[in-house]
Amino acid sequence: MAISKEKKDELIKEYARHDGDTGSPEVQIALLTSDINNLNDHLKANKQDHHSYVGLLKKIGHRRNLLRYLKNKDIQRYRELINKLGLRR
């Protein structure tokens, strides 16, 4: 269920603000969004997997906090990221 190293490196390269950037809010949100989408697909096939559901809720909460931080810090970067990821905000 975790994303592959290649997919993770691709996401980091796409959303990084500079070379070697792995900790910016944009990168973290993009990685969490990928994990959330994978977990959603898993839960559609495995409705009884409550442990994964709890993990999904934790990831959603973490992403929500990072999005709030980015929105308060730099609204322009927030809007660009929302559009790029296709989130409904």
Curated annotation (Swiss-Prot):
Protein's recorded name: Small ribosomal subunit protein uS15
HAMAP family: Ribosomal_uS15_B (MF_01343_B)
One cellular-component annotation, GO: cytosolic small ribosomal subunit
CDD domains linked to this entry: Ribosomal_S15p_S13e (cd00353)
Subunit structure: Part of the 30S ribosomal subunit. Forms a bridge to the 50S subunit in the 70S ribosome, contacting the 23S rRNA.
InterPro entries: Ribosomal_uS15 (IPR000589), Ribosomal_uS15_bac-type (IPR005290), uS15_NS1_RNA-bd_sf (IPR009068)
Alphabetized UniProt keyword annotations: Ribonucleoprotein, Ribosomal protein, RNA-binding, rRNA-binding
Record keyword tRNA processing present: no
GO molecular function: rRNA binding; structural constituent of ribosome
Task of the protein: One of the primary rRNA binding proteins, it binds directly to 16S rRNA where it helps nucleate assembly of the platform of the 30S subunit by binding and bridging several RNA helices of the 16S rRNA. Forms an intersubunit bridge (bridge B4) with the 23S rRNA of the 50S subunit in the ribosome.
Family: Belongs to the universal ribosomal protein uS15 family.
Signal peptide: none
GO biological process, one term: translation
